[in-house]
């Protein structure tokens, strides 16, 4: 697969059932039975970049997507997921903790694109991304929902560590 040509991401925000799934925002009830044919049709059509986040359905989205991606060769799937500051735990490094939880969920040793989901504290949450890239747990990093000043600051913080901001 030519990863440089990936320009369509399939989002999974509405995946999951009940109050922590698609019901909360979208009013839908998409579980594994409804989503398996969607995933397979996308895969057959050559779509492979999947965007999710731990906060989507409080894990439901990642778990559903992981159930499907485990059946595919890892090199055929691009996983994009996010660190969401508002649900960060009390660990010494909440960014790494959330990333490790996503890695375990997907049964993989790397995430293709890892995002800071929103700009709650650019100075606090951006530096740990560089460590994740350097460790090999994350291939590329991005920021989501940041304004221009926050994007510039995140870019500078990462550049100081020798890491590029790959997506906004």
Each language-model region and where it sits:
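N-terminal binding-site loop/beta-alpha segment at the start of enzyme catalytic domains
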Residues: 1-77, 134
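Conserved beta-strand positions
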Residues: 10, 52, 81, 113-116, ...
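Short internal beta-strands
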Residues: 80-81, 168
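Feature marks short, surface-exposed loop/turn motifs that line or immediately flank catalytic pockets
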Residues: 14-17, 56, 85-87, 117-120, ...
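Active-site mouth loops of central-metabolism enzymes
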Residues: 19-33, 83-93, 118
């Amino acid at each position: 697969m030519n990863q440089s040509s990936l320009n369509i991401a399939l989002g999974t925000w509405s995946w999951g059932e009940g109050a922590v799934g698609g019901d909360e925002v979208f009013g839908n009830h998409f579980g594994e039975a409804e989503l398996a044919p969607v995933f397979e049709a996308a895969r057959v059509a050559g779509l492979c970049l999947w965007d999710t986040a731990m906060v989507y359905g409080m894990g439901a989205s990642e778990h559903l997507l992981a159930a499907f991606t485990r059946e595919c060769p890892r090199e055929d799937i691009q996983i994009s997921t996010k660190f969401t500051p508002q649900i960060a735990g009390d660990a010494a490094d909440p960014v790494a903790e959330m990333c490790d939880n996503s890695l375990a969920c997907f049964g993989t040793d790397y995430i293709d694109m890892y995002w800071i989901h929103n700009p709650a504290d650019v100075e606090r949450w951006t530096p740990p991304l560089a460590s994740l890239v350097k460790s090999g747990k994350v291939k590329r990093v991005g920021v989501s929902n940041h304004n221009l000043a926050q994007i510039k600051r995140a870019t500078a913080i990462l550049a100081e560590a020798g890491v590029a901001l790959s997506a906004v």
